[in-house]
Amino acid sequence: MKVLYFDCFSGISGDMILGALLDLGVNLEEWKNELNKIPVEGYKIEISKKQKNHIWGTDVEIIIEDHHSHRHLEDLLEIVDKSELSENIKNRAKEVFYKIAEAEAKIHNTSINEVHFHEVGALDTVIDVLGSLILLDMLKVDKIYSSPLPLGGGFVNASHGTIPVPAPATLEILRGVPVYRDGREGELVTPTGAAIISTIAEFVKILPPIKVDKVGYGCGKKDFPFPNLLRVYEGELIEKVIEEKNVVLETNIDDMNPQIFGYLTEKLFKEGALDVFLTPVYMKKGRPGVLLTVIAPLAMEEKLLEVIFGETTTLGVRRIYVDKRIMQREIREIETKWGKVRIKVANINGIKKAYPEYEDCKSIAERENIPLKDVIGEIEKIIERELEV
């Protein structure tokens, strides 16, 4: 399994992500061709090698012709929708922009549609977000990990005046993400960097064993007593079986409108749950009820607890910490009469399993107006024939 690990020892920002990923050796011209699919003008990109505390990295400078362009969320979503980028990149970009909009709206006590994007709406940030997601798509990795994030400290001057570090919007975006303070001063994590990394990565305190193939360094703009760099490892997981730490959240509910459970389930998945399921149970005094079970990464525990307490009638939630073992897996593409279809392939000690991606099968069924079961059945025959599963 091909993985990336973001080693954020000096924090993270949008331009640092671009620099580190380009430093891994991604084809620059191919990346620029993908950027041309974004319907925006008035910028140029300068890429150079720079030194931070005697460590060389890639610096990305996005130069904007008009520095007074401000946009709202709907403007950013329109740019994404009108681009010719893949649906996966578009969906991820929308997640990032929504995160920042929701954080800014909460801090400034307004709605997400009324937020005036002084930073986020700036063209350089649009390129930071979409450019980073394009690079990740080009790298074709199966899993992305990140270290906990250093918050920095002190104060910085912003368009609204002097604000504490981390910036309020940044800290709002980082809810549920492992962070730490170590006495360093300065803004180490930007809102854009926080939104991108919290969307794409799983945060781990201990990196699973990997064979490192490449290392990339992306330069930050400020100079600190320490190297202001983002380091990214590209490599292969060594273990056939992957171990993860998860939390299982459970609560019994017998006094809530059942219509709410559908909305609750969707919201829990949106906030980072790995699985959510409902089990009919009989409770005390013979009352029928529902056992809500949520499985999630440890980093998402507090955010999901907030959703459960906010959206249900429960007064308490049980927490069970578990180890999960996962078969090594990768995403491949196979040719079918309907075009390319992604399949998930897992393998351990000669045991091989492969399944077609549901969303690809669903799209074919809707486009061709044929039963979903026929699409899945046909693709499973191809998998069995070509992969000998």
UniProtKB/Swiss-Prot annotation:
Pfam families reported for this sequence: Ni_insertion
Any GO molecular function: nickel cation binding
Ranges in a coiled coil: none
Record keywords, A-Z: Nickel
NCBIfam families the record matches: nickel pincer cofactor biosynthesis protein LarC
Family stated for the protein in its record: Belongs to the LarC family.
Name of the protein described by the UniProt record: Putative nickel insertion protein
Domain of life, per lineage: Bacteria
Record bears the keyword Hydrolase: no
